[in-house]
Amino acid sequence: MYQVSPQLSPRQALPTMYDLPSEEIGDPGLPDEFHLLQPELLRDTFRPPSYPEDEVFTASDLNLYYDLRQSQWYKRPDWFAVLGPLRRYDQQNLRLSYVVWQEGVNPFIAIELLSPGTEKEDLGQTLREINQPPNKWTVYEQILRIPYYFVFDRYTDTFHAFGLTMNRYQPLTLEGQGIWIEEIQLGLGLWQGSFQNRERLWLRWYDRDGNWLLTPAESEKQRADLEKQRADQVLLALSQEQQRTEEAEAEVARLKPLLQQSGINLD
């Protein structure tokens, strides 16, 4: 008598992030320091007000597996964001990759930072060879159908924005600071400033009032500055009160002899 193994559901039988490689030997690393810092600034300022923290996931340079029919194919966006009810992992179980059929939610935004070696791939200008993966543009537009796709060239400070309309990316017109995304109540624009002691033009998120969203470090500095300002105001008030007291005591000391001459004893 033999025991029959229970049948797995189709979803249980699919490869997960534990079955798929999270890195590939021979893959090039980050092309420059900008590709490290810019995603960090995007992550630190991406706070959609209508989504709780546990429904927001962002990543950079993480394998994004997108096609179950070709389960080994992946793209590695410079930065992407996922919104909605996300798969739960315990605190010690970090994502190795983002596998769309395992997660159940596709990215909402993808951002690519152009470099000479990836520009044609990112802009959909490469031809697909037989039995080879499609380029990023095709994956984002036609397979994952990511609603918003942004491309930034740090060499020319050129910023391109695309929105998905009728299953095709259409250019979006930059207005004011950048592009306003009503669904998440955030805008993405170009900010001139210093981040990690690097002064240049950066991509950064802003709120409905046009205020650039602060990074945690900036928020902490702002809090510390306000605390110092309040402390300085208290010290100034105490100093002024002490000065008034000293002036009053000096005036009493000046008037005391005159009053005594008039027969008035203050003691």
What residues fall within each predicted segment?
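A short glycine-rich, hydrophobically flanked beta-strand micro-motif that places a catalytic Asp/Glu
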Residues: 58-61, 148-150
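Acidic-basic catalytic patches of nuclease active cores, encompassing PD-(D/E)XK
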Residues: 32-60, 67-80
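C-terminal interaction segment
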Residues: 2-31, 45-48, 66-71, 87-145, ...
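Divalent-cation
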Residues: 84
